[in-house]
C-alpha cells in the first residue's frame, strides 16, 4: 500500500492552479481543412473529401447537452452532487464491488474523477482515478457508463477527455487498471494492453490488487491529442489512399467478358486479364473460405469466460508465482491455469471439448495434489470443477461426447 507521502492532497495537487478549473470542455470543432486540388493525374478521378462521421457523444457535447467535469472532494456543493452521482452509477454498474468501498474511494481526496454531466447536474458516467505524479502514472479505479446511455460513444469519448486532461495538467504518461473479463475488450479499444512495460518497482504496492482481475497498461503519446485522434486517423487513411490511387488501376471500369453477351456462363477467372494481373489463384480463394476457428470455438470461449468470472476462480487465474511458492514446480510437473488456457484457446489449440476439459481438470487435480483438502484452494478447485460440469451439461451435443 502506498505511504501517506505519496497520496495526492486536495489542497496541494487536486486544487493546483493547473487543475482549479473543475469543468473541462473539449475543443471539438472541426478544424478547417485545406482545399484539395480539383485536378489529378491524367485518367485519374479527382480526390474527394470524405466527411468525418462524428459520434453522438461529440455532437451532444458540441450542442451543450453534456459536459465533462473534473471533480474531487473539495467541499463544494456541485462537486459533492457530481461525486454522489458517480458513486451511484459505480455501485449499480459494478455490483461485485462492495458499496462502502466504492463510496470511500470516490469521496477520497487523493482521488480525482471525470464525469459526464447532463443539465442540471445529472451524471451519466465517469472515471475515478488516483494520480501518482512523482511516479508518472495513474490508477484507474472505477469506470462506468449508465446502462441506458451505452450506445452513444460516451465511453471512448470519456477516455479521450481523461487522457488529454491528465497530459495537460500533470507529468503522468501511463495508466494502470485492473479489468474484469467483461471490461478487457473496452480497455483494449482505448489503447490498453495486458503487456506491462512499467517496472514493478514503480507501481507495485501503490495500486489495489483485485482478485480475478487482469492488470492492463496504457502509455500515452505526448504529441497526440486524443480528442482529435479519429479525425487524424481519417486524414492518414486519405493520404494513404491517395498514394495508392497514383499507382492503382482499380478505379478503371472494365467491360464485361464477351462470353456474357448471350447470358451468364461458366468461365475461367484466370482468362480475365485483370484478375490474372492481380496475382489471384484458386488456392487463395479456397484459403479465404476456410473458417477462422473450429466449430467449438465460441462455446468454449463462453465456458472459459464463465469459469474466469466465477467466485472460486481466484486461485487459478494466473500461473503460480515461483518466487512466492518455491517448491510448487518441483511437485507439479504439468502446471496449468486459466490465463494459459485463454492463450491456447486463442491459438485454436482446443479442437474438441475433450481437449479443453483435459487442461481444466489439470488445474483442479494439480491444486488438490499440492494443497490439503481442507484449504481454501482445494475447496475452490472443487467448486469451480462442479460449476464447469454444470455448464457442460447444459450443452446437449457436448454431454453426449464428454
Swiss-Prot record:
Acetyl-CoA binds at residues 143-145, 150-156, 182-185. GO terms for molecular function: histone crotonyltransferase activity; histone H3K14 acetyltransferase activity; histone H3K18 acetyltransferase activity; histone H3K9 acetyltransferase activity; histone reader activity; lysine-acetylated histone binding; transcription coregulator activity. It is an enzyme of class 2 (transferase). Residues 1-12, 26-37 have a biased composition (Basic and acidic residues). GO terms for cellular component: ADA complex; chromosome, centromeric region; cytosol; nucleus; SAGA complex; SLIK (SAGA-like) complex. Disruption phenotype: Leads to decreased N6-benzoyllysine levels and enzymatic activity of adhB. Decreases conidiation and seed colonization, increases sclerotia formation and aflatoxin production, and increases sensitivity to cell wall damage stress. Residues 1-49 are annotated as: Disordered. GO terms for biological process: negative regulation of induction of conjugation with cellular fusion; positive regulation of transcription elongation by RNA polymerase II; transcription initiation-coupled chromatin remodeling. Belongs to the acetyltransferase family. GCN5 subfamily. This is Histone acetyltransferase gcnE. The gene is gcnE.
